[in-house]
Amino acid sequence: MMVYIMNAFDIKSTKMDVLSISLHTSDLFDLEDVLVKLGKKFQESGVVPFVLDVQEFDYPESLDLAALVSLFSRHGMQILGLKHSNERWAAAAMKYHLLFCLSHSENVKELGQVEVQNTEDGQKARKTVLITSPVRTGQQVYAEDGDLIVTGAVSQGAELIADGNIHIYAPMRGRALAGAKGDTSARIFIHSMQAELVSVAGIYRNFEQDLPNHLHKQPVQILLQDNRLVISAIGSE
């Protein structure tokens, strides 16, 4: 079996609890009234990060995002990203330098619970998230506490993140980060390897040049061995 081994930087991941704000109104005056009271709590704790869930709004034009981000910021609440089930919101997020989280929709399906074999350590059952649509530049998809399966093409500048494994059954030109919470047994499986960056449990490799022919645009798996990323062709001996 031909194996391509890369040395990589060690990145120490850190955990940051991020709350989600489900927005129910676009009225800045109503929000201001609430934030004057609620904001005092967060101002005492310093700046608190949030993801803004805008699922109740169909179009980005429904909201004055610049004013919203500024309003929350003045009250000690830092908006890091937007969450919506429609990909049209990705461009709006990029415009204001925010992350975009694709929430569950008809193109995002939970495949249910997969039983974990070893339950003695109290591990939770792992969920799998399936993405059937292309993941475009600037979009980020995160499978929390589970695996991620993508059947659409992943564009350069798109980012896939999973706490478990990542499976990509299409050309992969973006970034894939498996084992995001430190699972060193996580793996990445790619049908057509053209990624710009891959990472397992914080150990990553940035690809500035194409891989050798037996790996470039070929099915590969990526895993950790002795704290090094190993990229091997699937089906090779």
Curated annotation (Swiss-Prot):
Bridged cysteine pairs (disulfide): none
A biological process from GO: regulation of cell division
Gene3D superfamilies per UniProt: 2.160.20.70, 3.30.70.260
Keyword Ubl conjugation listed: no
Keywords associated with the record: Cell cycle, Cell division, Septation
Pfam families, sorted: MinC_C (PF03775), MinC_N (PF05209)
InterPro entries: CAP/MinC_C, MinC, MinC_C_sf, MinC_N, Septum_form_inhib_MinC_C
Top-level taxonomic group: Bacteria
Function: Cell division inhibitor that blocks the formation of polar Z ring septums. Rapidly oscillates between the poles of the cell to destabilize FtsZ filaments that have formed before they mature into polar Z rings. Prevents FtsZ polymerization.
HAMAP family attached to this UniProt entry: MinC
Family: Belongs to the MinC family.
NCBIfam families the record matches: minC
Self-association and partners: Interacts with MinD and FtsZ.
Protein's name according to its UniProt entry: Probable septum site-determining protein MinC
Classification lineage: Bacteria, Pseudomonadati, Pseudomonadota, Betaproteobacteria, Neisseriales
